[in-house]
């Protein structure tokens, strides 16, 4: 008996295969940290999703494991009605500087947030001082609050600006007049 067209189409459909755990994901699992493995980025950097609550603990563990440099922190919007994403890209720079490694190890931590209400993530400013202005910019452009940040103010937009300009559902005002001349 020949398969029906629906069954034939399903048989030809590609099967989604989970990415193989990279070295950082394996290490986190050995340490008992819950996380979700994501596909590596376009250049092969390991990407890991973590819950906002566990971000500081996992980041501190990674720092003690050699990831001593915050290359960048940022955010992006997956689209109207979708999630906001906060990410931290960490490097293990000291290993290369000391000569104990030939190549820099990299990992990107991602926190997926609902756009409803007030999305928030614990600040990593206390762990990586370089997160200061980067977290402020992410707040300014996407409205993601960073709990525990010492200067939770807008960085680029005027203090009285309404909305978050890099959200994909942002509606630009017709007119804005600066109140203070510089």
From Swiss-Prot:
GO terms for molecular function: NADH dehydrogenase (ubiquinone) activity; quinone binding. It catalyses: a plastoquinone + NADH + (n+1) H(+)(in) = a plastoquinol + NAD(+) + n H(+)(out); a plastoquinone + NADPH + (n+1) H(+)(in) = a plastoquinol + NADP(+) + n H(+)(out). One of its GO terms (cellular component) is plasma membrane-derived thylakoid membrane. It is a peripheral membrane protein. It is found in: Cellular thylakoid membrane. GO terms for biological process: photosynthesis, light reaction. Keywords: Membrane, NAD, NADP, Plastoquinone, Quinone, Thylakoid, Translocase, Transport. Pfam families: Complex1_30kDa (PF00329). The keyword Membrane applies. HAMAP family: NDH1_NuoC. Belongs to the complex I 30 kDa subunit family. NDH-1 shuttles electrons from an unknown electron donor, via FMN and iron-sulfur (Fe-S) centers, to quinones in the respiratory and/or the photosynthetic chain. The immediate electron acceptor for the enzyme in this species is believed to be plastoquinone. Couples the redox reaction to proton translocation, and thus conserves the redox energy in a proton gradient. Cyanobacterial NDH-1 also plays a role in inorganic carbon-concentration. NDH-1 can be composed of about 15 different subunits; different subcomplexes with different compositions have been identified which probably have different functions. PANTHER family: NADH DEHYDROGENASE [UBIQUINONE] IRON-SULFUR PROTEIN 3, MITOCHONDRIAL (PTHR10884:SF14), NADH DEHYDROGENASE UBIQUINONE IRON-SULFUR PROTEIN 3 (PTHR10884). This is NAD(P)H-quinone oxidoreductase subunit J. It comes from Synechococcus sp. (strain WH7803). The lineage of its organism: Bacteria, Bacillati, Cyanobacteriota, Cyanophyceae, Synechococcales. The gene is ndhJ.
């Amino acid at each position: 008996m020949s398969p029906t067209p629906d069954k034939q189409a399903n048989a030809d459909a590609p099967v989604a295969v989970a990415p193989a755990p990279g070295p950082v994901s394996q290490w986190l699992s050995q340490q008992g940290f819950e996380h979700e493995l994501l596909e590596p980025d376009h250049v092969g950097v390991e990407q890991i999703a973590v819950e906002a609550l566990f971000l500081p603990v996992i980041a501190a563990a990674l720092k003690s494991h050699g990831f001593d440099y915050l290359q960048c922190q940022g955010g992006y919007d997956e689209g109207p009605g979708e999630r906001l994403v906060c990410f931290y890209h960490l490097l293990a720079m000291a290993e290369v500087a000391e000569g104990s490694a030939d190549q820099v190890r990299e990992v990107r931590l991602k926190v997926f947030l609902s756009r409803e209400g007030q999305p928030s993530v614990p600040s990593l400013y206390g762990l990586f001082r370089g997160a200061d202005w980067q977290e402020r910019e992410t707040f300014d452009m996407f409205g993601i609050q960073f709990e525990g940040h010492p200067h939770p103010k807008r960085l680029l937009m005027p203090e009285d600006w309404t909305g978050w300009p890099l959200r994909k559902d942002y509606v630009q005002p017709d007119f804005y007049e600066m109140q203070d001349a510089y």
